[in-house]
Amino acid sequence: MTEAASPARVWIALAILAVAGSFFFALGSAPLFDVDEGAFSEATLEMFQRGDFLSTYLNGEPRYDKPILIYWLQAASVAAFGINEFAFRFPSALCATLWVVLTFLFARRYFPVERALVAAAVMATSLGVYVIGRVATADALLNVLIAASMFAVWLHLETGRPGWLMAAFAAIGLGFLAKGPVAVLIPLAVTFAFCLLRRDLKTWARAVFDPLGLLLFAVVALPWYALILHREGWAFVQGFFLKHNVGRFGGTLQGHAGSLVYYVPVVLIGSLPFTTLLIRVLTRVREVWHDDLQCYLLLWFAFVFVFFSLSGTKLPHYVLYGMTGMFILMAVYASGLRSRLWALLPVLLFFVFLLALPQLVEVSLPRVPDAYYREALSNAGRYFTWGYFAFAGAGAAVTLWFMRDRRIELARKLVVTGILATLGISAFVMPVAAGIQQEPIREAARIARSRNLDVIMWRLNAPSFSVYYGRPTPSREPRPGDIVITKARRLAELPGYGHELIYSKNGIVLVRVTG
């Protein structure tokens, strides 16, 4: 019994380390990243400043991008931990942890416990989940609620128990309160496709139109929408439903366009270091298709992949809404992986890329068209510390050793490289990105705050400035006497005015406009 239990204990330890390292290690060390982290965090702070916890504002203007649930969670975290990066990110880390735990619990019902633990560890240390579990946005919250609804719906379809259906409606209602219609669309469409394939649309219709379930959804989701519609009226409908939902699918929002194959590299990179496992599942589609549960999980991934590939607006994290089922399938088929070289090659290339990154940045500088990014990247060298190179080199060395070793289980090797990668990215790679992009914003804000300067933002979208500044920062055309935060390249565009430099770093300037 001890010998049989030993592998499970190892996987338990790896899964716990994977979750702790991916979502909580150095969670508050990096400054908030713009645009999204800055926008969510500042909107949460303005709820406190306005004494209004029903509607969201960003720099004094109504913000209709997302519903209220993530802001409530961030507000609770700020109340508990204070105004800092950890507090803003903690709800995402907590939701990502719950997402992994739910995936493990679901997988354990149908597969050996070791495979369920593999699914949890693979999921927690995959690059895409690692990132989304650490950022102060609504996406980790949405993912756990989509996963909860999809698991509950399957359990209802399998057992017929109404309790699982009620759990699904509750999760969908919370998802609608977290990010809107997408939380309804995914379980609705995937279950329709599955029941259609199984020629059982009657069961689907009974579940979808269950009166008690619809009532539960309405009780969970609709009160806030009713209140905000009463308060904001058509502006909310236009801003949230039409612009940020219909508009995202039908057109390109905020420049986030992409081709039909946009998500192919996104999925391959986002699955690192487990890309080979993903490819293995895709080569076993016929086998997957003939198992009801595996077919359901594959349909979940396929619908999300196709739907967002057809969408006019594309962002990398959208495809994660369908990856939960794929992570379970990757764990199920991991035991059949034999080639150490093939399995570990993607993560080796990742570490080699990190080693070469400083040189790649330097070589590519002349080809960067935007003067702001060119100036910011020109100072990148100072942020690549010896620790960065030691981490990337050690990761490559461990991976090469794993390629030679024949004793350790291949899936275990992949998870260990995933844990090394996530810990190293948090400790050494994120500080590089933060130093280049966000440190100038934070430093400028702290200078303005310490001197009690009245600042406006001009031709710059950096809401994290307001978080560190401690108050909303209006955006408008500058006038003589204004203190302006902007990009250095924009100074030449000041309409006939001069300026006095207060702060300058990496293409960001804080200036006083003179007549």
List each model region and its residues.
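Membrane-integral, polyisoprenol-dependent glycosyltransferases
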Residues: 2-342, 504-509
